[in-house]
Amino acid sequence: MRPAHAEPSRSCRRRTAGPADHDLRGRCLHERWRTGGIQERAAHGHARDRCAGTIDRPLLVYLFDPYCPWSYGYLPALTHLLDAVRDEADVEVVTIGLHDGTRIDQAPAPMRAVQRATGVGFGPGYRRALAEGEMQLRSRDAAAAVIGMTAADPGRVPDVLWAVHRAFFWAGRSLSDGATVAQTAQRLGLDGAAIEVFASSSRAAQMAEEDFHLARDLGARRGPTLLVSHGDRLCELEGPGTSGQHLVEQFRGVLARP
């Protein structure tokens, strides 16, 4: 059995119709159902336009956790891929729910291993928070923030992921803190106050739980997983340690298969 953050198997499987099928489109994942206005969602507690999208394009599904150091390390390669295929594929981010109140000193990042494999660095704020050991990691709160930011600007998924990861792994800020969420959103040019309100709502918590359930159905592990849904195939691309160009080549290979 390979380690949680080792190179994925790059496996592909055919999806057949049936009650147990991981049919992403059937679960409205592919149709960008999170594109309702943040302020309206915060006020009314529901998502709009759940099924308004393009179903003929391949779908990249990224399973990750904002508090996962290997997800942070995967970002350079993932960003390269998303930039390269932005006109060819839709993208959906699904959070996996890694932590539920874990203290930061009980989940220290393997900083040397991540930096050696991926090149990302860890900032003084994160190191200080780790040394203090008091922060509690609640993935549900972090997921709600990600959902709010990606819904506010669906075309900037890489920017949102970088901003959220760096808020924690560089600045050492808690993603359960409303001020952190608002400031992170504002730096992206988004309405920080509205996103803070949404992220603290019961609807955001419900949507985060929906993510966690979907991630489990899709076989999420404790590290990042990148899937391509194309036709009747669901394929896994390589994980942390690979290059962005290699991900592009793998993606094109999936599309080229009969």
Predicted features by range, described:
Residues 56-60:
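Extreme N-terminal starter segment of soluble prokaryotic enzymes
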Residues 1-40:
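Rieske [2Fe-2S] iron-sulfur-binding domain
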Residues 3, 96, 239:
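Active-site donor-binding loop signature of nucleotide-sugar glycosyltransferases
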Residues 64-67, 75-83, 163-258:
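C-terminal cap of thioredoxin/glutaredoxin-like
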Residues 72-169:
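Structural alpha/beta surface segment adjacent to cysteine/selenocysteine redox centers
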Residues 4, 68-71:
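Short cysteine clusters
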